[in-house]
């Protein structure tokens, strides 16, 4: 009975990368860490929690001992590197030379470089940090790993941070050892090849949303253009022509007029490249020729453009809710009531305007709901739970429905304003007429592609048929047309 009571309540088991429990070896290898910064402390915490024996080497162990877990041994650097076979080098590149005095003790051991250069250092040095470390310690095996994992992710665990650990080294056995450690810590190792790949791996943390740069600049450019256009029509024109001060509209009213224009055009730009790609395939008669680079990049940025469209649409909805809260709106209501009294009208009701408002608000809510569905299904956790047909239906079919609803929302908002002369201020057409051009072209093109003569040809091309091919090809059930040829 006493023997049972001496057993620990929690066994030395770890959560593996797939969520299952993985056994740690009974005699876990001793791991050394050189450095006492934030990353070194987080790494030590994670290693201790995973059942490893951790020795931390510091220049001043008495000062830094209280910052590390109690189970981690904090000592001088010479003692920390004496027994472990795997040593994490958690110091900056400029401090590598201070470790040269340990070269004899480090010989034959695995050095794991976890550092990242600054943008200036990355451009200045041709060698990666890991390659530079390997040149200083030729008798050691250098592995680049854990540099894309943040200190917070190490402390919080892989469930709340990035799970992938990118690993590169010239020695397969060393990569295997570090991969096993990463799995024991609950992460997913990913082999990136030899140590020559370390420069590319070190560049990853330096990137700031690379796939969002062009879509964001596009959205900002559209916002500036539409805001300037609306400012000229709604603020500048009344000031010049009628001497009316409408500058109070700039912070909210003009912004709210601009937001739906940007959202609508961005949504159109999500589906325009698909139309261009289909037209190009029909013209070429094959799918095996590459698209132009500009079209290829455009197709790859559709997700980001769509999410920005949803963002601007949500802002438009929030701004619209704020419109009745403005002091200027309250003054307009009072002035309208005074005019009604002076005109001796007991009831003001315009049936056409009432119906128009009800319809276009309803269509706007439906369009925003569709965009919300598209945004949710673009999340990796949701997208991974859908098969390709389900994902394609939501993003392609329902997305096109959202474009149609947005077009109907815009048309009912504009109503007959496009044909009324007083709405052409400075001879500039209403803003909504400009936004309608591109979506209407896309909807018309999509409708043309649904015609049997184009639809069947496009389907054949995407199944491998070629206009000037050499292999007989016929779609299932296509008995009425002659045989075609293909290189399938």
Swiss-Prot record:
Vesicular side: 229-258, 326-358, 412-433
Binding sites annotated in the UniProt record for NADP(+): 36-39, 58-59, 91-98, 116, 151
Effect of loss of the gene: Mice display iron deficiency anemia, due to a defect in iron release through the transferrin cycle.
Signal peptide limits: none
Segments crossing the lipid bilayer: 208-228, 259-279, 305-325, 359-379, 391-411, 434-454
One Gene Ontology cellular component: endosome membrane
GO molecular function: cupric reductase (NADH) activity; FAD binding; ferric-chelate reductase (NADPH) activity; ferric-chelate reductase activity; heme binding; metal ion binding
The name this protein goes by in its record: Metalloreductase STEAP3
Organism encoding this protein: Mus musculus
């Amino acid at each position: 009975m006493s023997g049972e009571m001496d057993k620990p309540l929690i066994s030395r088991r770890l959560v593996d990368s797939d969520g299952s429990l993985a056994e740690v070896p009974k005699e876990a290898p001793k791991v050394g860490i050189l450095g006492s910064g934030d990353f070194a402390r987080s790494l030590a915490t994670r290693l201790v929690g995973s059942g490893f024996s951790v020795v931390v080497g510091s220049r001043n162990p008495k000062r830094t001992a209280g910052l590390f877990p109690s189970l981690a041994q904090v000592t001088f650097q010479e003692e920390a590197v004496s027994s472990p076979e795997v040593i994490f080098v958690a110091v900056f590149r400029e401090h590598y030379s201070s470790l040269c005095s340990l070269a004899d003790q480090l010989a034959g051991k695995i050095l794991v470089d976890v550092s990242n250069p600054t943008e200036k250092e990355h451009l200045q040095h041709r060698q990666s940090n890991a390659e530079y470390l390997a040149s200083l310690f030729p008798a050691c095996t250098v592995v680049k790993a854990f540099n894309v994992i943040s200190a917070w992710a190490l402390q919080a665990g892989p469930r709340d941070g990035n799970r992938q650990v990118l690993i590169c080294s010239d020695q397969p056995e060393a990569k295997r050892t570090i991969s096993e450690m990463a799995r024991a810590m609950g992460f997913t190792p990913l082999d990136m090849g030899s140590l020559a790949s370390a420069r590319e791996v070190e560049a990853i943390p330096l990137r700031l949303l690379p796939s969002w740069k062009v879509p964001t600049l596009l959205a900002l450019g559209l916002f500036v253009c539409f805001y300037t256009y609306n400012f000229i029509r709604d603020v500048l024109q009344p000031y010049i022509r009628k001497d009316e001060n409408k500058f109070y509209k700039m912070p909210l009213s003009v912004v709210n007029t601009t937001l739906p224009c940007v959202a609508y055009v961005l949504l159109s730009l999500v589906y325009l490249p698909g139309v261009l790609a289909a037209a190009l395939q029909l013209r070429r008669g094959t799918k095996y020729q590459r698209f132009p680079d500009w079209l290829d990049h455009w197709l790859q940025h559709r997700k980001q453009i769509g999410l920005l469209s949803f963002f601007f649409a949500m802002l438009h909805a929030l701004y619209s809710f704020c419109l009745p809260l403005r002091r200027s709106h309250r003054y307009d209501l009072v002035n309208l009531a005074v005019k009604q009294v002076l005109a001796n009208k007991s009831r003001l009701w315009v049936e056409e305007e009432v119906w128009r408002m009800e319809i276009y608000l309803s269509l706007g809510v439906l369009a925003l709901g569709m965009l919300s569905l598209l945004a949710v299904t673009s999340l990796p956790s949701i997208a991974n739970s859908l098969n390709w047909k389900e994902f394609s239906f939501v993003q392609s079919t329902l997305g096109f429905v959202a474009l149609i609803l947005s077009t109907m929302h815009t048309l009912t908002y504009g109503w007959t304003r496009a044909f009324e002369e007083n709405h052409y201020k400075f001879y500039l057409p209403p803003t909504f007429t400009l936004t309608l051009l591109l979506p209407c072209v896309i909807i018309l093109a999509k409708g043309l592609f649904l015609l049997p003569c184009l639809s069947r040809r496009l389907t054949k091309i995407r199944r491998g048929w070629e206009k000037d091919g050499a292999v007989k090809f016929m779609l299932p059930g296509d008995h009425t047309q002659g045989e075609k040829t293909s290189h399938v």
